[in-house]
Design a protein with these regions (language model features):
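C-terminal catalytic lobe of FAD-dependent flavoproteins
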Residues: 279-395
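Conserved beta-strand positions in the Rossmann-like core of class I SAM-dependent methyltransferases
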Residues: 29
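Active-site substrate-recognition segment that forms the wall
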Residues: 6, 13-24, 33, 41-48, ...
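Short beta-strand to alpha-helix junction loop
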Residues: 56-67, 92-98, 133-149, 254-259, ...
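Dinucleotide-binding Rossmann-like beta1-alpha1 core, especially the glycine-rich loop
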Residues: 46-124, 129
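Conserved dinucleotide-binding and phosphotransfer motif residues
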Residues: 24-26, 153
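Helical element adjacent to the flavin cofactor pocket in flavoenzyme catalytic cores
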Residues: 133-187, 191-192, 196
Length: 395
């Protein structure tokens, strides 16, 4: 029986997994290479919580919609509520308006409705030149406080400066080698971003995307969070957060003046009335980090078979999947590839993993687990003939 679980990664993916599992009675050890939680893409000071909507027909099976509702419910819990500022979010209409969102949407006039530019301006406290979708329950999370609260669960032990160097299966347990020593676990959850010396995720494709936010000294009497492709938050701790750049395959995390300028230009283009209110960029702060995405932009969450990639090289592609021997390995799970949506989506990923560990039915449609299945890319490559090599070609 699973008693002790090691989670690698102390960003929102790992911290939410740890909390959900600890809440179900497991002892959880979280290992992270950094000296504090949220050192990667989860470490921006504020994280915006809002959904990207789809039409009424697709909503019941839409990951982001379901994740948004689930996250809002969790954030009402007292220990989390203090880290959530429910400012509401105005999603400004773009040139390509959201035709799918209208009175037929199941959330209409309850969780979302449309405001004309005058009403949107009154809601925001600043002049806006276009209509917007209004999400009254949305807002932003103060990330540091939330991560620390998640990791403070009585069943969670967080170990920092613990870079994981490898993991091997020994009978029914994992033995994890880190710079803070060895750890044994009945199950292992990998929830770290990007590359690692652990080979257990070979075949799971991730792409880095650099993003830089700008922190602007308080200058705007903004009451709500504005989204327009980028975003602008009300002042918090003396700064507005403006974000964010999007630079695929850029691995550097230095703060760049041109990225500040990009954020300023996007803000001025979408909210012209605020352009002249911005303080000089010399007063701006910033943070750059890497967000990791999958090819289909859905995260990977659930059980992963690290032997699958090699096993499929022995089988030519065909319509139906081959029957493979069950790997003699302890359980391995992943929660990775959340991109910029981790603070909304990671909770659902954590629940999916916990449900698989405990063999508990999921409250969400079966299609969600299939959409997030980590091994979907390996099977896809096999079906497309990218894995199999005839024996004579192997020498």
């Amino acid at each position: 029986m699973t008693q002790h679980i090691v989670v690698v990664g102390a960003g929102i993916a790992g911290a939410s997994c740890a909390w959900v599992l600890a809440n179900r009675g497991y002892r959880v050890t979280v290992l992270d290479a950094a000296s504090q939680p949220g050192s990667g893409g989860s470490g921006n000071p504020l994280a915006i919580i809002y959904p990207k909507l789809v039409n009424a027909e697709l909503t019941p099976n839409h990951l982001q919609s379901l994740a948004y509702l689930h996250t809002l419910a969790l954030l009402q819990q007292p220990q989390f509520a203090e880290h959530f500022q429910q400012t509401g979010v105005l999603w400004l209409d773009q040139d390509r308006s959201l035709q799918d969102v209208d009175a037929t949407h199941p959330w209409w006039q309850e969780k979302v409705w449309r405001l004309d530019s005058k009403a949107a301006s009154e809601q925001a406290g600043v002049a806006l030149n276009r209509s917007a979708l209004w999400f009254p329950e949305a807002g932003f999370i103060r990330t540091d406080g939330l991560l620390r609260t998640l990791l403070a669960h009585e069943n969670v032990r967080a170990v920092f400066n613990a870079r994981v160097c490898g993991a091997e299966a020994l009978k029914s347990q994992w033995r994890i080698n880190s710079t803070q020593g060895y750890f044994s676990a009945d199950a292992l959850v990998l929830a770290y971003a990007g590359s690692s010396s652990i080979s257990l995720t070979d075949g799971l494709p991730l792409r880095p995307v650099r993003g830089q936010i700008s922190q602007i000294p308080t200058a705007i009497p903004l009451r709500t969070t504005l989204c327009y492709g980028g975003y602008l938050t009300p002042s918090d701790s003396g700064y507005h957060c403006v974000g964010a750049t999007f630079s695929p395959m850029d691995l550097q995390t230095d703060i760049r003046d041109q990225d500040h300028q990009f954020n300023a230009n996007e803000l001025g283009k979408n909210i012209p009335a605020l352009a002249e209110s911005l303080p000089l960029q010399v007063t701006w702060l910033g943070r750059a980090s890497l967000r990791w995405q999958t090819p289909d932009f859905s995260p990977m969450a659930g059980r992963h078979d690290p032997s699958l990639l090699n096993a499929l090289t022995e089988h030519p592609p065909r319509k139906h999947r081959p029957e493979l021997a069950t790997p003699d390995l302890p359980p391995l799970y992943v929660s990775i590839g959340h991109g910029a949506k981790g603070y909304t989506q990671a909770w659902v990923a954590a629940e999916i993993i916990a449900n698989e560990i405990t063999n508990t039915p999921s409250p969400w449609p079966e299609s969600i687990a299939k959409q997030l299945a980590p091994d979907r890319f390996i099977w896809r490559d096999w079906q497309r003939g990218r894995l199999w090599t005839p024996r004579r070609a192997r020498g």
